[in-house]
Amino acid sequence: MKPSDVRSKAFAMPLTSPAFPMGPYRFVDREFLIITYRTDPDRLREIVPEPLQVTEPLVHYEFIRMADSTGFGDYTESGQVIPVEYEGQPGGYTLAMYLDDHPPIAGGRELWGFPKKLASPTLHVNTDHILGTLDYGKVRVATGTMGYKHKELDIDEQTKRLAGPNFLLKIIPHVDGTARVCELVRYYMQDIKMKGAWTGPASLELAPHALAPVADLPVLEIVEARHLVADLTLGLGEVVYDYLAQ
């Protein structure tokens, strides 16, 4: 194969059979359980990279069920998103996500810079409540519950919240182990069709784990819980800050 052929075909690895396809990446009936809680503000400031700014000591703990996604298939994801501001613009910084499917792990890390790791999350209705769990290996590290559809939420408001900017710290090492890419990336959910939004009483339990340290941001108080179902497109990203260029 000639170098020009490599350049023209290069998208992802392996070259002859990429781990994920080119987009757009559309999700149908994507289901969220988002439990917002108050945590230690000092710990937040220690882990959120500038120029992002922590405005409130809050964390969104998310369980996401994606049964129909373009190119990625059927999978579930769980992790923590921290409310932040960038140049006065409110958004969410994804700290870490744990999921059970290789293509979105590879694509998420290589394209956008999603901090994804392999684990075993679940999200389903358990009799009278919706239940989210996260197991890392044989250890249960997160359990979230919410009363099932106790009260409807405003569809337009929840659509607007989901459409806000999201931020990622994309890191790709050079072959010698030094940083080759170290960028703050912004992306948006696009073409959102909110099909339902509800709230109810909720609980969240986090357990310590050396390699899935969700409990490092302790739950001090449950602030809000939301159960959402939507169709949406995961938009590609843009670099807003290059740490290596500073």
Swiss-Prot record:
Catalytic function, reaction form: acetoacetate + H(+) = acetone + CO2
A GO MF term: acetoacetate decarboxylase activity
| InterPro entries registered for this protein in UniProt | Acetoacetate_decarboxylase (IPR010451), Acetoacetate_decarboxylase_bac (IPR023653), ADC_dom_sf (IPR023375)
Q: Which Pfam families match?
A: ADC
Record's keyword terms, sorted: Decarboxylase, Lyase, Schiff base
Annotated active site: K116 (schiff-base intermediate with acetoacetate)
Signal peptide (UniProt feature, chain positions): none
| Enzyme Commission number(s) | 4.1.1.4
Q: Which NCBIfam families match?
A: PRK02265.1
Q: State the family named in the UniProt similarity comment for this chain.
A: Belongs to the ADC family.
Q: What does this protein do?
A: Catalyzes the conversion of acetoacetate to acetone and carbon dioxide.
Spell out the HAMAP family in the cross-references: ADC
Which protein, by its recorded name, is this? Acetoacetate decarboxylase
> What's the source species for this entry?
Burkholderia cenocepacia (strain HI2424)
Gene, per the UniProt record: adc
